[in-house]
């Protein structure tokens, strides 16, 4: 296993495979099927460790864990002009900024 494993994992049920599937957000092409959630998590963690070790040995860039990334709180979203207008009107009618309205809608 990785010494300082800080990657983001998820275990979910696969109806198609009739098993649990372990996934890693930072390595979207990897997965591990197992009969129990615990085994799926252990399996995907081992696969990630093996792949990261191989990448390091080949001097490839290993993905940075999401948990270590800095988030500024800002991102740009492109929307159609008519939606921009509707949201601006809704914000004005509510007496809030467009940013505050968009943030409230995104957090729902």
Predicted region positions:
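A short, exposed loop/beta-hairpin motif centered on an aromatic-Gly-Thr core
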Residues: 28-39
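Short aromatic-glycine-(Arg/Gly/Cys) micro-motifs in beta-strand/loop hairpins
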Residues: 11-27
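Short, charged, surface-exposed hinge/linker loops at domain edges
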Residues: 1-8, 45-108
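Intrinsically disordered, low-complexity segments enriched in polar/charged residues with Gly/Pro
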Residues: 18-21, 40-41, 63
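Short, charged/polar surface micro-motifs in flexible loops or helix N-caps
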Residues: 27-28, 83
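Short acidic, gly/pro-rich beta-turn/loop elements at beta-sheet edges
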Residues: 19-21, 32-34, 87
């Amino acid at each position: 296993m990785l010494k300082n494993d800080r990657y983001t994992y998820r275990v979910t049920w696969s109806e198609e495979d009739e098993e649990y599937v372990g996934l890693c957000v930072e390595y979207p092409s990897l997965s591990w099927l197992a009969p129990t959630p615990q085994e799926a998590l252990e399996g995907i963690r081992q696969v990630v460790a093996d792949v990261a070790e191989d990448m390091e040995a080949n001097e490839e860039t290993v993905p940075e864990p999401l948990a270590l990334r800095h988030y500024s709180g800002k991102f740009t979203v492109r929307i159609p002009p008519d939606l921009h207008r509707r949201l601006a009107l809704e914000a004005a009618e509510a007496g809030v900024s467009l940013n505050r309205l968009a943030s409230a809608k995104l957090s729902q």
